[in-house]
Amino acid sequence: MGSAQSVPPEMRALAERTGFTSEQIEQLHRRFKQLNHNRKTIRKEDFDTIPDLEFNPIRARIVHAFFDKRNLRKAPAGLAEEINFEDFLTIMSYFRPIEMDMDEERLESFRKEKLKFLFHMYDADYDGIITLQEYKNVLDELMSGNPHLEKESLRAIAEGAMLEAASACMARTGPDEVYEGITFEDFLKVWKGIDIETKMHVRFLTMEAIAHCY
């Protein structure tokens, strides 16, 4: 993929587009080849070889997100059957750790990109709105990974979280309007003050998800 001293134009373009350094891109390219067994693309089943995802309660959603055309910036809806290395880098860039030298404008843009990715994980039907049922589905999946919580406790936590999310967004709803769900603008309000910048990242070599996205 090139060396740090003589960076090919292709590598430079990828670095500018994704924010990764050339060394990080080379590292991710090695991981990409491990996943696809030296093919040119990755399919969903290739993620079955990642041990750290095996017991993640939202594993299916994480894998789905890699093929979501919204996250790939290719279309407003739909799934890709396979992704190439540039697509893989695009998705991994959402998990890129915060840089200490980011100014306020870049940090805000960085935060919005991460939250847009997370929003798409909730918005399963691509309509730009997270319904309360979609919100509950994700929470149910997340909390299913805790064997110490009883079913009634899970339901109470989910309902409470949904009510909190809805109440944060319903102030702008008129008396004759029906609350349909959470838009991305609402989602930004719900997540205001939550440190998504440092929580949502992935270890490059193992692709172990560090994010606690709920």
UniProtKB/Swiss-Prot annotation:
Binding site for Ca(2+): 123, 125, 127, 134
Record keywords, A-Z: Calcium, Cell membrane, Cell projection, Cytoplasm, Differentiation, Lipoprotein, Membrane, Metal-binding, Myristate, Nucleus, Protein kinase inhibitor
SUPFAM superfamilies (UniProt xref): EF-hand
Name of the protein this chain belongs to: Calcineurin B homologous protein 3
Keyword Repeat set for record: no
Lipid moiety-binding residues (N-myristoyl glycine): 2
Species per Swiss-Prot/TrEMBL record: Gallus gallus (Chicken)
UniProt function note: Functions as an integral cofactor in cell pH regulation by controlling plasma membrane-type Na(+)/H(+) exchange activity. Promotes the induction of hematopoietic stem cell differentiation toward megakaryocytic lineage. Essential for the coupling of ERK cascade activation with the expression of ETS family genes in megakaryocytic differentiation. Also involved in granulocytic differentiation in a ERK-dependent manner. Inhibits the phosphatase activity of calcineurin.
Classification of source organism: Eukaryota, Metazoa, Chordata, Craniata, Vertebrata
Tissue: Expressed in the bipotential gonad by E4.5 and expressed in both the testis and ovary by E5.5, but with expression higher in the testis. Expressed in the testis cords but also at low levels in the interstitium. In the ovary, expression is principally in the ovarian cortex, but also in the medulla. Also expressed in the embryonic brain, with expression highest in the region between the nasal placode and olfactory bulb. Also expressed in the embryonic heart and tail.
